[in-house]
């Protein structure tokens, strides 16, 4: 059973938790993280989701994403998700939060990392990840057009690639890394 911390609209923890999969109440929010790992030659490590996954099954996606569990900080969740899904150990110093997107019932923190990784040595989490590969922005946008990548707005892919080399933004209320 996975528990999530519940936040208010200003991203303050409420002191309450909820079980994953339960409906969220109005005014309740949870924390999600996405991590984009880039190679030194500017390609993003992307993953293909398992065909039996709920939501976007069998489609390609950015490197890693997942929900923060109760007690996690954003950066803890980011490091844990990368370790669990693709077997890469990252220190907090390697993770750089580049932006936060508010969505219906949550906050989605995006991190970028530049790290050359030998994909043949990765330990993929069977429950989540089918395979991984390196791809540039044009290849990812072509995959979106082909319907084999999660249908992000293509300009958002450009933003992710832009942020790999530039400092991102954070909310005024969130000054922690």
Task: Describe the residue ranges of each PLM region.
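Acidic, metal-coordinating catalytic segment for phosphate/diphosphate chemistry
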Residues: 1-34, 40
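Short loop segments at secondary-structure junctions
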Residues: 10, 39-42, 50, 114-119, ...
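A short, polar/proline- and glycine-enriched secondary-structure boundary/capping micro-motif
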Residues: 25-27, 55-59, 133
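A glycine-rich, hydrophobic loop/mini-helix early in the fold
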Residues: 32-64
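The catalytic Nudix box helix
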Residues: 45-46, 63-96
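Nudix hydrolase/Nudix homology domain
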Residues: 58, 70, 97, 102-106, ...
């Amino acid at each position: 059973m996975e528990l999530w911390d519940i936040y208010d609209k200003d991203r303050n923890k409420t002191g309450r938790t909820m079980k994953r999969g339960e409906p969220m109440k109005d005014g309740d929010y949870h924390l999600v993280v996405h991590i984009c790992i880039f190679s030194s030659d500017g390609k993003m490590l992307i993953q293909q989701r398992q065909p039996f996954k709920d939501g976007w099954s069998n489609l390609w996606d950015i490197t890693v994403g997942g929900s923060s569990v109760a007690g996690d900080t954003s950066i803890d969740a980011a490091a844990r998700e990368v370790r669990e899904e693709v077997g890469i150990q990252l220190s907090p110093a390697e993770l750089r939060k580049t932006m936060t997107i508010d969505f219906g019932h949550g906050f989605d923190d995006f991190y970028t990392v530049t790290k050359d990784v030998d994909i043949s040595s990765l330990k993929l989490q069977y429950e989540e990840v089918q395979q991984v590969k390196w791809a540039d922005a044009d290849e990812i946008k072509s995959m979106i057009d082909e319907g084999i990548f999660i249908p992000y707005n293509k300009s958002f892919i450009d933003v992710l690639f832009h942020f790999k080399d530039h400092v991102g933004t954070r909310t005024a209320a969130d000054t922690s890394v």
